[in-house]
Amino acid sequence: MNYTFQAEQARDNLINEIRNLAEAQGFTRVVIGISGGKDSTVTAALCARALGAENVFGVMLPDGEQVDIADSRRVCAALGIRSRTVNIGKIHTALREATDQLGPVAGEGEFVVPPHRESDINVGPRLRMTVLRYFAQALGARLAGTGNLSEATVGYCTKDGDTSCDFATLLGLTSVEVVRVGLTMPEIPRDLVQKTPTDGLSGHSDEERLGIRYADIHRYIREGTCGDPETDEKIRRKEQANLHKRRMPVTLDPFAKGADA
């Protein structure tokens, strides 16, 4: 497969896409969740170039103590965008305590809710999305998505969490390509563009949790294979299992014919 990527052209295309969308839909402001990682950093920079830094609002959403929140502040300062911080830690704790009270024992007519670590981990992104939607509506702004194609392909994202947005800024770029685009924008700190991606939830890097390198996912997407059949199959299985995260909910047809009730 013949693959070429022009980072500067991709950057300029995305800036124009944001401007065109804003004009078509009649909005001038965007809200972005700023994690301090490459995806939100590059998204914020693209939006600032497209709409002006004064129209970009960064929201920092630590869950309790965030050890690298200084990186989030650096992004906002470097781009000249205004920001606010909302700590979702107490909200997450309250929800965790409420669900813990359900316990492993169910009363008559109730069902058992077993403890589930991944469910708890995914509460964070969903709470963040609730706060971001609040800010966007209050400011009359659109919510810019920050997820990339590599994450979406293997389902490394939270349904109704970071997948929720009004436009998906980077969903046409792999993780590798996001870095390349980011490196064409001198206004953002280079080290943040090249920062090791983590989920900010489990204490592990993305690649550690996935068991797959982003470079391999990139090659799988752009070349059809990463060069290792076993890894290709691992990516393919994740892709198929997580298609539901990339599609609108299935609408059932009440007028379908030929089905037995």
What are these regions (language model features)?
Residues 37:
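Conserved G/P- and acidic residue-centered "switch" motifs that form tight phosphate/ATP-binding loops
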